[in-house]
């Protein structure tokens, strides 16, 4: 492929970049309505979504949570520092929490963020490593903010590597940071059109996770939690099995994949939501496009709805693009304009000729901050 072709080709991806970040924010904002709910009837979900069409509600009526707040910190750090800078990213996390603590942060991560705020802290990974008696967190907090890594790095290896490092700032258990890698890889593959072949998409993710779960630390953590030796691979195989069935109930999805705050119980679930909603489904309006179906279905699962919808929205948005997202949904959610701006900045740098000629430097893209 010529250099000119490599420069022109990414132009078609602008919509996908924007869709990924905006879809993430929408899932977070819209999903907050049902967070923690055990039973979420589909008609309640559809009623909630139809209310977004009401022009009298005003802009920013649905607030974003810590999911979006921390995702923005990741994006800003990558854009500003040119590479993954753990200290810069950690400081942004701490500053964001201090500025706006009422975003629904969990008690565990709050302890970490307060320690990260200390000017005397030498190792920014240490507070997370000290969590839960040294076992670290296996929650989905690293995965919920992983989208910018999928946009900032070209190679799959770098997406995998740096999304894990970014998650380790708050989640030092391999179940936590490997979940972040899985989410980032799913968005990365979706950006490249891999969802056109759903089974190949899953197979690629399984292959990636097999490499990560061969690690001795991952094996140790899985054993300590009484899980299978390759927990994410096992869940992804369950996703494939569910996809092969002619009929799947919400109860079965929750039983097989989960809907909780653990990364293992939510990242594969988000991936399933996207795959399941590639085609129209009973109970969902025919007028809904794929992204709308994905978010609606994510909410109907209950549990950690804002984060599951956030992750599913990012993967779906990277596939369908910004034009698939209803404008009424966008203006009803806080932080959409900022997410769109971050996506455009990442995209603009992605298209720079000098960047395309220097594909092997393993650095994320950045802006000039002068």
From Swiss-Prot:
Record flagged with keyword Nucleus: yes
InterPro entries named in the record: ADP-ribosylglycohydrolase, Ribosyl_crysJ1, Ribosyl_crysJ1_sf
BP terms from Gene Ontology: DNA repair; negative regulation of necroptotic process; peptidyl-serine ADP-deribosylation
Major location (coarse): nucleus
Residues the record lists as binding Mg(2+) 2: 35, 304, 306-307
Activity modulation: The protein undergoes a dramatic conformational switch from closed to open states upon substrate-binding, which enables specific substrate recognition for the 1''-O-linkage. The glutamate flap (Glu-35) blocks substrate entrance to Mg(2+) in the unliganded closed state. In presence of substrate, Glu-35 is ejected from the active site: this closed-to-open transition significantly widens the substrate-binding channel and precisely positions the scissile 1''-O-linkage for cleavage while securing tightly 2'- and 3'-hydroxyls of ADP-ribose.
Keywords annotated in UniProt: Chromosome, Cytoplasm, DNA damage, DNA repair, Hydrolase, Magnesium, Metal-binding, Mitochondrion, Nucleus
GO MF annotation list: ADP-ribosylserine hydrolase activity; hydrolase activity, hydrolyzing O-glycosyl compounds; magnesium ion binding; O-acetyl-ADP-ribose deacetylase activity; poly(ADP-ribose) glycohydrolase activity
A Pfam family that the UniProt record links to this protein: ADP_ribosyl_GH
Compartments, record wording: Nucleus; Cytoplasm; Chromosome; Mitochondrion matrix
EC identifiers of the protein: 3.5.1.-, 3.2.1.143, 3.2.2.-
Residues that coordinate or bind substrate: 66, 135-141, 171, 225, 261
Catalytic activity of the protein: [(1''->2')-ADP-alpha-D-ribose](n) + H2O = [(1''->2')-ADP-alpha-D-ribose](n-1) + ADP-D-ribose; 1''-O-acetyl-ADP-alpha-D-ribose + H2O = ADP-D-ribose + acetate + H(+); O-(ADP-D-ribosyl)-L-seryl-[protein] + H2O = ADP-D-ribose + L-seryl-[protein]; alpha-NAD(+) + H2O = ADP-D-ribose + nicotinamide + H(+)
Binding-site list for Mg(2+) 1: 66-67, 306
One GO cellular component term noted in the UniProt record for this chain: site of DNA damage
Cofactor(s) it depends on: Mg(2+)
Glutamate flap (site feature) positions: 35
Cofactor binding comment, as recorded: Binds 2 magnesium ions per subunit.
Gene3D superfamilies: ADP-ribosylation/Crystallin J1
Primary role: ADP-ribosylhydrolase that preferentially hydrolyzes the scissile alpha-O-linkage attached to the anomeric C1'' position of ADP-ribose and acts on different substrates, such as proteins ADP-ribosylated on serine and threonine, free poly(ADP-ribose) and O-acetyl-ADP-D-ribose. Specifically acts as a serine mono-ADP-ribosylhydrolase by mediating the removal of mono-ADP-ribose attached to serine residues on proteins, thereby playing a key role in DNA damage response. Serine ADP-ribosylation of proteins constitutes the primary form of ADP-ribosylation of proteins in response to DNA damage.
Stated family: Belongs to the ADP-ribosylglycohydrolase family.
Subunit structure: Monomer.
Protein name: ADP-ribosylhydrolase ARH3
Organism: Danio rerio (Zebrafish)
């Amino acid at each position: 492929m010529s250099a000119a072709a490599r420069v022109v080709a990414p132009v078609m991806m602008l919509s996908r970049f924007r869709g990924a970040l905006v879809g993430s924010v929408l899932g977070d904002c819209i999903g907050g309505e049902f967070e923690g709910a055990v039973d979420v009837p589909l008609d309640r979900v559809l009623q909630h979504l139809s209310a977004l069409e009401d022009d009298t509600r005003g802009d920013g009526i649905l607030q974003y949570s810590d999911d979006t707040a921390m995702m923005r910190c990741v994006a800003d750090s990558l854009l500003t520092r040119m590479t993954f800078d753990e200290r810069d990213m950690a400081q942004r996390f701490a500053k964001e929490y201090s500025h706006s603590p009422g975003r629904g942060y969990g008690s565990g991560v709050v302890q970490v963020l307060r320690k990260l705020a200390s000017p005397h802290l030498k190792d920014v990974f240490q507070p997370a490593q000290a969590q839960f008696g040294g076992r670290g967190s296996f929650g989905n907090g690293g995965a919920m903010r992983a989208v910018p890594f999928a946009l900032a790095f070209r190679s799959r290896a770098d997406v995998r590597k740096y999304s894990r490092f970014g998650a380790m700032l708050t989640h030092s258990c391999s179940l936590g940071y490997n979940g972040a890698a899985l989410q980032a890889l799913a968005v990365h593959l979706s950006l490249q059109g891999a969802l056109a072949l759903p089974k190949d998409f899953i197979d690629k993710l399984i292959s990636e996770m097999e490499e990560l779960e061969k690690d001795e630390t991952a094996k140790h953590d899985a054993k300590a939690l009484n899980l299978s030796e390759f927990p994410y691979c096992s869940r992804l195989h369950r996703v494939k099995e569910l996809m092969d069935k002619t009929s799947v109930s919400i109860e079965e999805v929750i039983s097989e994949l989960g809907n909780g705050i653990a990364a293992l119980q939510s990242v594969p679930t988000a991936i399933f939501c996207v795959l399941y909603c590639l085609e129209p489904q009973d109970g969902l309006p025919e007028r809904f496009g794929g992204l709308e179906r994905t978010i609606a279905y994510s909410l109907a699962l209950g549990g950690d709805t804002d984060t599951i919808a956030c992750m599913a929205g990012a993967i779906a948005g990277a596939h369908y693009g910004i034009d698939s997202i209803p404008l009424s949904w966008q203006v009803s959610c806080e932080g959409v304009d900022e997410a769109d701006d971050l996506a455009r900045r990442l995209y603009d740098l992605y298209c720079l000729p000098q960047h395309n000629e220097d594909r092997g430097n393993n650095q994320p893209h950045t802006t000039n901050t002068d």
